[in-house]
C-alpha cells in the first residue's frame, strides 16, 4: 500500500505476508493477547493463570464462555431464590403449626387446672360432710366385725 492510499477493508494484518516472530498467528488472537497483556501490565486483578487461560483463546470464545458463566450464575441465583422462598415457607408453616399446638396445649392445661380445682373443692366438701357425720355415725371402726363373715348382721 502506498502512502496516502485508503486501506482495503478486506485486507487484514493476519492476511498480509509477514516476517518475524508474530507470523502465523491470527490477528484476533494477537489483538486479544495485546489487550490482556496491557490489562495485566496496568495492574488489574488478572492473575497469570487467567491471563494464560484467556490468551490462548479467541475473543469470541471468551465472550461465549463469559455469557455461559453469566447464564449459569443467573440460573443458580434463580434456583437459590426459589429454594430460599421454599425454605421461608416451610419455616412459616412450622412456626404456624407450633403456635397452634402451643395454643391447644395451653387450653388443655387451663382445662385440667380448672378440673383440679373442682376436684379439690369437691374433696373439701366431702371432708366437711364426713366430719359433720362422724359424731352421729353408728358404725364405728371398733364395732366392725372381722372379714370372716362380712355379710352377717351386726350384734349390738
Curated annotation (Swiss-Prot):
Gene3D superfamilies: 1.20.5.170. The keyword Transport does not apply. It holds the Pfam family bZIP_1. One of its GO terms (biological process) is regulation of transcription by RNA polymerase II. Residues 56-95 are annotated as: Disordered. Residues 70-133 form the bZIP domain. Residues 72-94 are annotated as: Basic motif. It is found in: Nucleus. GO terms for cellular component: nucleus. Keywords: DNA-binding, Nucleus, Repressor, Transcription, Transcription regulation. InterPro entries: AP-1, bZIP, bZIP_sf. Disulfide bonds: none annotated. Residues 98-126 are annotated as: Leucine-zipper. GO terms for molecular function: DNA-binding transcription factor activity, RNA polymerase II-specific; RNA polymerase II cis-regulatory region sequence-specific DNA binding. Transmembrane segments: none annotated. Component of the AP-1 transcription factor that represses transactivation mediated by the Jun family of proteins. Belongs to the bZIP family. ATF subfamily. This is Jun dimerization protein 2. It comes from Danio rerio. The gene is jdp2.
